[in-house]
Structure formats: C-alpha cells, structure tokens
C-alpha cells in the first residue's frame, strides 16, 4: 500500500474561487451565493405583480376588474389566480395554454403562477442569505430559522392549500381586497376561526406583539447612563461595549408586577423568538390541514338542540349560520363558472329572524 503525503493544489484561477471571491466580497449590498436565487426571483416576482396590478384584467378568470387601467386603486387591484378549469397547470408562457402569446398568457392568469413561484423561491433565497451572512461573520443561524415561519405561511397558503383543492383558482389572489375575500372564504368554507391551529397562530402573533412592546418599554425604562446626544439614537455609539440598561432593575420590577420575571437574557430573547415562530408554524400546519379539508371543532350537540329548540342559540350556532350565509352568498359570486343559483328560501336565517 502506498501512502501519498502532500497537499492537493488547485489551479490558481479556479472558476469557483473566482466566483466565490466576487459574490462574497465586502460591498454596500452583499450578494453572496444566495443572491443568485434571491435577486432574480425577487425582481421577477415584484415586476410581475406591478405589471399585473397595472395592466392585466381578471375578466377571463374571475369576471372582475383588477388593474389600475380598469379603474382599481391600490387596495382593490390584484394579480388574480387562474380559472378553475386550468386546475394545477404551471401556466408556462411557452406551454400548451398560452403557446408563447404573452397577452393570452396574462389573460389566462399566468402572472399569478409566475409571481407565486418566483415569490416563494425569493423568500427562500432571503432565508439562505441570512444563513450565508451568519456563517460568514460567525453568528448562529436563528435569524434564518425565525424567517422560516413567514415562508411556511406563504407556502402553505399560496401553494399547498390550492394544491389540495381543485386548482390554483382557490388560492388567494395577490392584492389587499383579494386577501380579505380569501379570509372570508376560509371562514365560510372551513370555519377557520374555530380551528385550533388558527388559535395558536393568533396567540403567537399577538403574544409576540405584547412581548415586543413590553421588552422595548422595559429597556427604555431601565436606562441608567445618559449620553450627550439630543436623543437615545444620537447618544450612544452602536458598537459600545457596555450595557446602558439594568437587567437587575427590570427583573425586580416585573417580579413585583407579575410575581415572576425573566432572570436570564438568553431565555428572555429565546422566548421572544419562540412565541411568534411557533405560532406561525402552527397556523401553516393548520392551512395544510385545510388543503385536505380537515374540519375545525364541531359542537354537534349544540347544533341539534338549536335546530329543535327555537329559543336555544349560542354564539357557536350563530357563527355556523353565518358561515352558511357566506357559502350561499359567496359561492355564486366567487365561482361564476359553476352557474350556481340559490333561491331565497334556502338562504340561511337565524332563529332571531
């Protein structure tokens, strides 16, 4: 057996090294390897959205006006989902649907799949950017881990949910009022507010807002060293070595207020990371469940009693009737291709009516 000792030498002008040196060079805007995914995808996603909201109608897919050109404003313009008949087609510009015709591609809803897919990969690229920069400056990757939560929500709502339904048609369109319509749809057809995963998501987001407000106020309240500047932002150097607020004072204050308090800054900040990230991940899992048409809580005994006794009604039974109303009124407008017609007598009315 021969053992070779020595060092493997590469060519001085190795292409990978040249690329690595240029991509990771210290500049005003870091590019990095992740930038090869992030910047093109973000550019195309934003460009597609601005193009769609400015010029493209939704007449052929939803029977709606959805662009500034047709009279919409920022709140009502949208890039709409493709028609239900197109199912889960990727709607490639060169595909069998548009056959290279850009105008026809826009009319069919091709911009929605374009924006959704480039947007998803752009978000993933941004998370990889945080990983790459953290590794470069020897930080731990918790920023990237935290950013995985909004990515999970985006992917579950815009991609996984419609994949579980009959087509991209049932995903949210990219617009403010369009998202509101989608929320009403989720409530009416899935009773989303009574879903335990939605409850965990709300607890995570609102709990994080509360923690953030308490934390910021506590740090401001316990500042003990004043600088010469006119305000907090001018008073201190951002690279100062010493703390200028008192963790001990904050601990004593909240111990008196609540009876318990964080005594360790690592645990405090981990908790502030854990609450919103876990909440968003739970809500994303809930949306995956809705893609499979899993149901929320059902209190059937209350529904049966409400049906038998005109004087018995709970907030739950009222909400169930409201959901039926949303479905009956919304389906005919939201799915015009189904030609749904509901006579007046089948539209739900509560016991009070």
UniProtKB/Swiss-Prot annotation:
Q: Where does a plastoquinone bind?
A: 215, 262
Q: Where does chlorophyll a ChlzD2 bind?
A: 118
User: Where along this sequence does the record place binding of Fe cation?
Assistant: 215, 269
- Where are residues bearing N-acetylthreonine located in the sequence? 2
Q: Name one GO biological process term.
A: photosynthetic electron transport in photosystem II
Describe the subunit structure: PSII is composed of 1 copy each of membrane proteins PsbA, PsbB, PsbC, PsbD, PsbE, PsbF, PsbH, PsbI, PsbJ, PsbK, PsbL, PsbM, PsbT, PsbX, PsbY, PsbZ, Psb30/Ycf12, at least 3 peripheral proteins of the oxygen-evolving complex and a large number of cofactors. It forms dimeric complexes.
In its miscellaneous comment, the UniProt entry states: 2 of the reaction center chlorophylls (ChlD1 and ChlD2) are entirely coordinated by water.
The text of the family note is: Belongs to the reaction center PufL/M/PsbA/D family.
Name of the protein in its database record: Photosystem II D2 protein
Q: Which organism is it from?
A: Illicium oligandrum (Star anise)
Which gene name does the record give? Answer: psbD
């Amino acid at each position: 057996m021969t053992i070779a000792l020595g060092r493997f030498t590469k060519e001085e002008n190795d292409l990978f090294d040249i690329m690595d040196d240029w991509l990771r060079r210290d500049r005003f805007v870091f590019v990095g390897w992740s930038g090869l995914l992030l910047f093109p995808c973000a550019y195309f996603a934003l460009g597609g959205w601005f193009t769609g909201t400015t010029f493209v109608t939704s007449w052929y897919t939803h029977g709606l006006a959805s662009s500034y050109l047709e009279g919409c404003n920022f709140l009502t313009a949208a890039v709409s989902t493709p028609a239900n008949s197109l199912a889960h087609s990727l709607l490639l510009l060169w595909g069998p649907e548009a056959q290279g015709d850009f105008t026809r591609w826009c009319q069919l809803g091709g911009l929605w799949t374009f924006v959704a897919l480039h947007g998803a990969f752009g978000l993933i690229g941004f998370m990889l950017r945080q990983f790459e920069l953290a590794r470069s400056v020897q930080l731990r990757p918790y920023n990237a881990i935290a950013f995985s939560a909004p990515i999970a929500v985006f992917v579950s709502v815009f991609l996984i949910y419609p994949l579980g339904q009959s087509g991209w048609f049932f995903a949210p369109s990219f617009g403010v009022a369009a998202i509101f319509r989608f929320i009403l749809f989720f409530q009416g057809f899935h009773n989303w507010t009574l879903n335990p995963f939605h409850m965990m998501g709300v607890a995570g987001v609102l709990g994080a807002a509360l923690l953030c407000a308490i934390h910021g106020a506590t740090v401001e309240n316990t500042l003990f060293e004043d600088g010469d500047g006119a305000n907090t932002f001018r008073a201190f150097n951002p690279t100062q070595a010493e703390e200028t607020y008192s963790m001990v004072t904050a601990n004593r204050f909240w111990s008196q207020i609540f009876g318990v308090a964080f005594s360790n800054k690592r645990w405090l900040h981990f908790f502030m990371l854990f609450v919103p990230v876990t909440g968003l991940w739970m809500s994303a899992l809930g949306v995956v469940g809705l893609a499979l048409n899993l149901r929320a809580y059902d209190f059937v005994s209350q529904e049966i009693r409400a049906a038998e006794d005109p004087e018995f009604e709970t907030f739950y039974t009222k909400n169930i009737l409201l959901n039926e109303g949303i479905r009956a009124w919304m389906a005919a407008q939201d799915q015009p291709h189904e030609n749904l017609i509901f006579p007046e007598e089948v539209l739900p009315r509560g016991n009070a009516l």
